[in-house]
């Protein structure tokens, strides 16, 4: 759909064109990647064992579906492109399955057992984990320059900006 071709002209004397393609996010350089194992609380299981004389075996069960959102910590141009670059770099560094949106479904269970002693109240908290990614994104204005039979990309007005993101672990 958006494909363009430029054919060579045999006599392209005096032929010159500069086409502005846009202001793009060109590069992302990671400075720090750190996991946060308690990024967002997603569930609480509760049991009151005060009236019992026997221990209660407590399991984790997700009570409601929970959507965990990540995102950039600042507004930047071309945010979707920056998110993709940061996601790729963070996944490469951590070797974890990352996504800017993670869903924990209702009824999700874990087989691990927690014994609740008699005459006690028990709370079991569940948290979604996330990775905090910080770095620097580079922007530039991209031009297609045609001069005679020569074609080239030229990048002008290059700027850098610090950026951070929270990326939930799936």
Give the positions of each predicted feature:
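Membrane-insertion modules used to breach or fuse lipid bilayers
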Residues: 54-110, 136, 140, 149-150, ...
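Proline-rich intrinsically disordered, low-complexity coils
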Residues: 10, 35, 77, 97, ...
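Deployable pore-forming modules of oligomeric membrane-permeabilizing proteins
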Residues: 1-71, 99-103, 107-113, 146
């Amino acid at each position: 759909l958006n494909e363009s071709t430029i054919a060579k002209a045999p006599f392209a004397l005096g032929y010159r064109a500069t086409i502005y393609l846009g202001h793009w996010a060109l590069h992302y350089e990671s400075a720090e990647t750190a996991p946060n194992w308690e990024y967002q609380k997603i569930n609480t299981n509760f049991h009151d064992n005060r009236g019992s004389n026997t221990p209660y075996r407590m399991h984790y069960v997700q009570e409601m579906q929970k959507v965990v959102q990540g995102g950039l910590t600042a507004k930047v141009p071309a945010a979707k492109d920056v998110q993709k670059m940061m996601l790729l770099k963070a996944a490469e560094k951590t070797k974890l399955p990352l996504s800017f949106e993670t869903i924990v479904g209702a009824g999700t269970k874990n087989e691990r057992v927690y014994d609740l002693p008699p005459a006690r109240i028990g709370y079991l908290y569940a948290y979604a984990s996330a990775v905090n990614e910080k770095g620097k994104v580079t922007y530039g204005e991209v031009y297609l320059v045609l001069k005679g039979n020569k074609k080239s990309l030229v990048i002008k007005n290059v700027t850098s900006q610090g950026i951070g993101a929270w990326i939930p672990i799936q």
